[in-house]
Amino acid sequence: MNLIICCTPLQVLIAEKIIAKFPHMPFYGVMLSTVSNKKFDFYAKRLAQQCQGFFSMVQHKDRFNLLKEILYLKRTFSGKHFDQVFVANINDLQIQFLLSAIDFNLLNTFDDGTINIVPNSLFYQDDPATLQRKLINVLLGNKYSIQSLRALSHTHYTIYKGFKNIIERVEPIELVAADNSEKVTSAVINVLLGQPVFAEDERNIALAERVIKQFNIHYYLPHPREKYRLAQVNYIDTELIFEDYILQQCQTHKYCVYTYFSSAIINIMNKSDNIEVVALKIDTENPAYDACYDLFDELGVNVIDIRE
């Protein structure tokens, strides 16, 4: 049996493609997420339907629950053996402990998003070398780090064909198929993709409200991890993540999709004549986020600078 570990709805979409490559091998699915909402629950169920066995857990960031959940994962998975393991978030401490608790023959990785192809992202760095982290690793038995898992990965499955990834051995997969519907001539619907860029909700709300007004946004699709609510825009209420939703809707409507630096627009670029994408350049206060705009330029994305 193979093991596949997901942390986001996008990873579930990728996982479905990977599972399809092994039609005669059963999979055990794991869904670890930092939030619980209908979107995450919907994709967790989709993953479970593809797997012979399934485990899910909502993760917490506070120290007490983090340690409690590490012990729970170790107890749940200790001694289990898998042929191949597939994982995206090699930086996640709880995933590192889960991997330390099991035996496996082969480790493979897959994309978490543009973080995989943006230089100097956290996947190209190592874990924090703090005394606290070292003590946790030693006392609770973590055998792995970001870089040791990169080195161990046999194959990396990527939705970004032609780009350098965290390891050299890559196998491209097509996340979504092109839509061959006829070009729609109706009025364009402007959609803003939600993205919690800043730690403070107030800053995210202020930025979104400015963009909504400036670009005449008709609809807002919140990020799966968003917990705040905007007042002056119509929400798209769907269990589907952006890629699934927009490729259904573009068959009968024409869209212009605005984002800050979401990898989602890369996933649907050139998939339909009824979808246009625009990236809005902002002050992110994060070099890894800023590097996304260089990537967008390379891909030919229309980038509009709205920095104040």
UniProtKB/Swiss-Prot annotation:
The active site is at residues 201, 223. Optimum pH is 6.0. Active in a broad pH range of 4.5-10.0. Low activity is found at pH 10.0 and no significant activity is found at pH 4.0. The keyword Glycosyltransferase applies. Divalent metal cations are not required for the alpha-2,3-sialyltransferase activity. Belongs to the glycosyltransferase 52 family. Changing residue 25 to T: In strain: ATCC 15742 / P1059. It comes from the Bacteria. The keyword Oxidoreductase does not apply. Keywords: Glycosyltransferase, Transferase. CMP-N-acetyl-beta-neuraminate binds at residues 221-225, 242-243, 262-263. InterPro entries: Glyco_transf_52. It holds the Pfam family Glyco_transf_52. It is an enzyme of class 2 (transferase). Catalyzes the transfer of sialic acid from the substrate CMP-N-acetylneuraminate to lactosyl lipids as preferred acceptor substrates in vitro, forming alpha-2,3-linked sialosides. Beta-1,4-linked galactosyl lipids are better substrates than beta-1,3-linked galactosyl lipids. The natural acceptor substrate may be cell surface oligosaccharides in lipooligosaccharide (LOS), whose sialylation has been demonstrated vital for the virulence of P.multocida. This is CMP-N-acetylneuraminate:beta-galactoside alpha-2,3-sialyltransferase. GO terms for molecular function: glycosyltransferase activity. Has been used successfully in the preparative scale synthesis of sialyllactosyl sphingosine (lyso-GM3), which is an important glycolipid and an intermediate for synthesizing more complex glycolipids such as gangliosides. Its EC number is 2.4.99.-.
